[in-house]
């Protein structure tokens, strides 16, 4: 018979988060749940992410804060690039009108992520308060969008949070087949070039696992997080040369 989880802490504005070790365990109704309440502002989100905590809740719920154990993480060196997708990236790089942009349409990206249908989900966790809060994070340089553009149209992309060299993937969308995967591959090339070691994926999904992500213990994740936080962050600009982190120089030739 499973034991009852401990009472869930309710946070007042600007109150410190509980230790992540106090998050509900795998035997609870909501493994990884740490606290509720608080405020969604830049400083609270910065403190949360720097401790391995993130918000995730649905419309009508209070703000819920999570720190799962284990944690889904994509080690940048382990990104799985299948030959067929490598060919698609090469074609993308060589096709006029196809390009990667960073931070040119953050609000469009997060709105598209919020409105994208998800298998097994009837709504979205990217509720209006979340969109507004992450928009503020973007304005202060702590949230970024990686965008796939085709002939001047936004075809897909993703957004993430970045503190130093600690990167946290949030959500992605596609309007054209594989456009979000191309944006993720661009982020991987960017991260490899700048020495970013891991991308936090938060929750386990088969899609992320197929790309090379895997679960690690919370303690191991927090060690990697601390290492990333200790380093100065890169300039969030994309250079076509970053593709060479995924493709050989010969692959880039025309």
Swiss-Prot record:
It holds the Pfam family Leu_Phe_trans. Its main location: cytoplasm. Keywords: Acyltransferase, Cytoplasm, Transferase. Residues 1-28 are annotated as: Disordered. Its EC number is 2.3.2.6. Residues 1-10 have a biased composition (Pro residues). Signal peptide: none annotated. One of its GO terms (molecular function) is leucyl-tRNA--protein transferase activity. It is found in: Cytoplasm. GO terms for biological process: protein catabolic process. GO terms for cellular component: cytoplasm. It catalyses: N-terminal L-lysyl-[protein] + L-leucyl-tRNA(Leu) = N-terminal L-leucyl-L-lysyl-[protein] + tRNA(Leu) + H(+); N-terminal L-arginyl-[protein] + L-leucyl-tRNA(Leu) = N-terminal L-leucyl-L-arginyl-[protein] + tRNA(Leu) + H(+); L-phenylalanyl-tRNA(Phe) + an N-terminal L-alpha-aminoacyl-[protein] = an N-terminal L-phenylalanyl-L-alpha-aminoacyl-[protein] + tRNA(Phe). Transmembrane segments: none annotated. NCBIfam families: aat. Belongs to the L/F-transferase family. Functions in the N-end rule pathway of protein degradation where it conjugates Leu, Phe and, less efficiently, Met from aminoacyl-tRNAs to the N-termini of proteins containing an N-terminal arginine or lysine. HAMAP family: Leu_Phe_trans (MF_00688). This is Leucyl/phenylalanyl-tRNA--protein transferase.
């Amino acid at each position: 018979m499973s034991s009852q989880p401990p009472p869930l802490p309710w946070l007042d504005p600007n109150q410190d988060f509980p230790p992540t070790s106090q998050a509900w365990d795998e035997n609870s109704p909501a493994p990884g749940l740490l606290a509720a309440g608080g405020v969604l502002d830049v400083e609270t989100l910065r403190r949360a992410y720097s401790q391995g905590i993130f918000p995730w809740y649905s419309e009508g719920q209070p703000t819920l804060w999570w720190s799962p154990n284990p944690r889904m993480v994509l080690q940048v060196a382990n990104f799985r690039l299948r030959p067929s997708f490598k060919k698609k990236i090469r074609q993308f790089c060589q096709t006029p009108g196809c390009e990667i942009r960073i931070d040119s349409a953050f609000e469009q990206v997060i709105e598209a992520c919020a409105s994208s249908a998800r298998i097994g989900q009837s709504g979205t966790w990217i509720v209006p308060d979340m969109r507004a809060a992450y928009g503020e994070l973007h304005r202060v340089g702590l949230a970024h969008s990686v965008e796939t553009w085709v002939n001047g149209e936004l075809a897909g992309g993703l957004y993430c949070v970045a503190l130093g060299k600690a990167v946290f993937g949030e959500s992605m969308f596609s309007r054209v087949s594989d456009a979000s995967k191309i944006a993720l591959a661009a982020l991987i090339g960017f991260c490899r070039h700048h020495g970013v070691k891991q991308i936090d994926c938060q929750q386990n999904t088969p899609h992320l696992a197929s790309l090379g992500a895997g679960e690690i213990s919370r303690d191991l994740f927090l060690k990697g997080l601390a290492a990333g936080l200790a380093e100065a962050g890169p300039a969030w600009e994309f250079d076509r040369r970053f593709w060479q982190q995924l493709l050989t120089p010969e692959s880039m030739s025309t």
